[in-house]
Amino acid sequence: MALPNAPTGELKAVRDPEVEEREVDILIVGGGMAACGTAFEVHKWLGDDQSVLLVDKAAMERSGAVAQGLSAINTYVGENAPEDYVRMVRNDLMGLVREDLIFDLGCHVDDSVHLFEEWGLPIWKKTDDGKNLDGKKGQKLGTLKSGAQPVRTGKWQIMINGESYKRIVAEAGKLAIGEDNILERCFIVELLLDANEENQIAGAVGFSVRENKVFIIKCKTMMVACGGAVNIYQPRSVGEGKGRAWYPVWNAGSTYTMCMKVGAELTMMENRFTPARFKDGYGPVGAWFLLFKAKTLNGLGEPYAGSDAAKAELEKYAPYGTAAITPTCLRNHLMLFEMKEGRGPIIMDTVTALAELGKTMDKKELKHLESEAWEDFLDMTCGQANLWCATDTEPEKKNSEIMPTEPYLLGSHSGCCGLWTSGPDYDWVPEEYKIKARNGKVYKQMTTVQGLFTAGDGVGGSGHKFSSGSHAEGRIAAKQMVRYAKDFADFTPTLAQSKEELVDLVYKPVRTFLDNYEYSTHVDFNPNYIKPEGMMYRLMKATHEYGAGTATYYMTTSKSLEIIMD
């Protein structure tokens, strides 16, 4: 909704918007990988008399964390066992996980990866003599499903040419669910409980970001998958770099906030993810560590990770710190340890890595390798490639600095915060991990609110899903929601609020602005309201200084937390 000071050409907001009311059996809120998985899967199970609607605040082709593309799929079990996948996730998140959710996902995630390849996603392949083939060359070796071997950069990761990854997945979802069942450019802001049935989801309300319109949507069951939370903490990129973050800036924490406000239980929200990335451009480091075999150095040029001091520090966190693979959070801890000891900054030794790989390659292969170093960024973080150009950085000639980012809240990467959801209804799953509906049945990924499901970043205690796992969780949720809607076919959602009350709720910021913007000489500064940007800066300042942001090396105290809560 545009305000009167918006650039010429935008539609100005009005006091009384148009209202559109809808009612469906199944409502999907979100347009990222999880929601695309749900959109693709739902019609396989949907009855002829059942209806579905997907609502996205953006456009599905470039919505969610994968919008800019990826250069790898980080979760593909393949020849490994789901039990080993559970062990890996448990170790990386230092035991704070739901093994039932992780195991169940590990049994299903590969099917989504096979679908991605079937839809046209180029996946790198390994030849019999150990050569790596990317793009169309890799496709000639066949599919993963038919037995072709992927190029592994680790035990679980596979390389892709993924600039258009999200577009490929979104197209499949849109074709499956049907364009008539998709509502884009609609920002859902509140979930609504049923007026008669206690603790039962009944609908949602939101507004169009293109028109002066409010949407009120009733439903029997709903999935909310709107990503994690970014810009809670002040990013390292400020000034003209404002808006550059690692996770997508449009992940506003809606998944957690909206579900929490209707009573859904949260879990592990104290678990924040702080990835190490190339400084300022937030470029990914995974391919450099795993594919190019690069090492990190401290400011003295020492490979600190294997030093006696580092080993002694890791032993404090045994058994996780002494495991064969050091957990992500402890690798970051070692970086901070070096910096606090005065041995910073931390450097990615790209020069040595490419030189070592080049010893076994001819000139053509080496040139291709150098191109892949750039494409790794162009596939998923264009800003980092721009930064390398602006600073005359050639990775084969000049090393780059890496740095832990500001903290993010998420549940699909190397973090595990989110909503408490039901595990699968298997005998070995503890009863306290199963959430039963009022009919006594268990519906996997249902939250503590009846009929409210989630996936991807929304599922707490189950990290390391990444893009493929989020898509698979969306597909699992689709089947469970259809089952729920069929089991409660006689349920008629009834909203406690009137249409007028919901419009007042959604358009209160607009009306407050229209009533008061002429009071001051500049619309950004007014004693009667605060604009979103001003609210964001206040939140960032508080978390940055008191809430364990980068300003305090990610540390806080009980007194600091009391200040921020005030």
Tell me the role of every PLM-derived stretch.
Residues 224-284, 467-480:
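Glycine-rich loop(s) and the adjacent beta-strand/alpha-helix scaffold that form part
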Residues 26-53:
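N-terminal Rossmann-like FAD-binding beta1-loop-alpha1 element of flavoenzymes
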Residues 45-68:
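Glycine-rich FAD pyrophosphate-binding loop
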Residues 487-565:
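Long, amphipathic alpha-helical stalk/connector segments used for oligomerization, subunit docking
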Residues 21-24, 211-221:
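Core beta-strand elements of the Rossmann-like FAD/NAD(P) dinucleotide-binding domain
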Residues 1-26, 44-45, 49:
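Extreme N-terminal leader/targeting segments of oxidoreductases
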Residues 73-106:
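Glycine-rich active-site loop/strand segments that organize a redox cofactor
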Residues 119-202, 269-463, 542-566:
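Mobile, glycine/GP-rich and aromatic-enriched active-site lid/loop segments adjacent to catalytic centers
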